[in-house]
Amino acid sequence: AVPIAKQELCKVIKFMARRLKNEGIEVRMNCEVTPEMLAGEFKDYEVVCSTGAVPKEIPPFKVFKQTMTADDVLAGRKYPGRKIVILGGGSVGCETADYLAPLIDDMFPANRDITVIEMTPSLMPGEGGAAKSQLTMRLKRKGVKIELNSQVTKVDETTITYEKDGQEYHITDADTLIFAVGYAPNKVENTEERVHFIGDCDKVGTLKDAIAAGHKLAEEL
């Protein structure tokens, strides 16, 4: 699935797929690249690694009865319950809340109760513009609970505890905890000069950053 606010990105992916096909570039799906493959079939090739990033989790909090990442939800790998807490109010956390919450004025709502916990004073810190304002307003209209300046301090199998303004609060009726706490580069360990890293596997950034890095490397090669 694609977050509601990023449906237009599908057009970019389809455009790039058409470009690859038109240029006659071979694409191998479901193919794991191994050291043997690099040393054999591709021994004379420059290798560009764009393996992306992996979502971060907080191991001590995984004791909760059901945990998953925002990526798990959006990719359809896991299915949350009805009482959901999303840890992290960045763009991914907010987009996941938007995706899971009932549509505005939905005649058959999903009846999900969603709480977003963010440790900074605002949602999607570091971002701005109309898209941020529209997403924030949409979350409020959908009834998503937003807890800012809040820090989760303890999680056990049934309870999520967080602090806000010096007070301690306990969420005891949640059935799902979703991690939206950032990403870490999924970098392949290889020090050969012919291996190049671009995109999130080099440094976590935006789609624009990844495309620019690919273009720059192609010019250099």
Residue ranges of predicted features:
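Rossmann-like dinucleotide-binding cores of NAD(P)H-dependent redox enzymes
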Residues: 1-23, 98-152
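Short low-complexity stretches enriched in small and charged residues
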Residues: 4, 40, 44-46
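Short amphipathic alpha-helical surface micro-motifs
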Residues: 8-10, 49-50, 66-68, 143
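Local beta-strand N-terminus motif with an aromatic residue
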Residues: 20, 43-45, 173-175
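Rossmann-like dinucleotide/flavin-binding elements
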Residues: 28-40, 50-66, 70-127, 155, ...
